[in-house]
């Protein structure tokens, strides 16, 4: 199966909660995340979600498409560690919240693992030893 990365797609999701959850320093009225899909030349699509806040979702999306995607398009999707190293510089920008780069990198990493598990027809939890 050809795991050459041909496209990266993201979708920002915001879902209201039925009730408000409160902690000592916060309240949650909704859940937010970014869904990432990686498409391959062989037709497989990996999918994962990461993040859980409104703040920064647009910037995370931008980091994925403007900083990470151009570097990994055309690469072998099974080379997960190598692609993580390629994506990692997105975490180095000291002028922005480092967490945003970490979530963007995690989004790609999780999606690559899902893609790899699908290529082996193995559930991801089994691939990881569960």
Where would I find each of the regions flagged by the language model?
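Structured beta-strand/loop patches that form or line metal/cofactor-binding pockets in enzymes
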Residues: 1-53
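Glycine-rich, flexible loop/turn motifs
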Residues: 13, 17, 76, 120-124
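Metal- or metallocofactor-binding catalytic centers and their adjacent structured scaffolds
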Residues: 39-120
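Catalytic pocket of metal/acid-base enzymes, prominently hydrolases
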Residues: 116-130
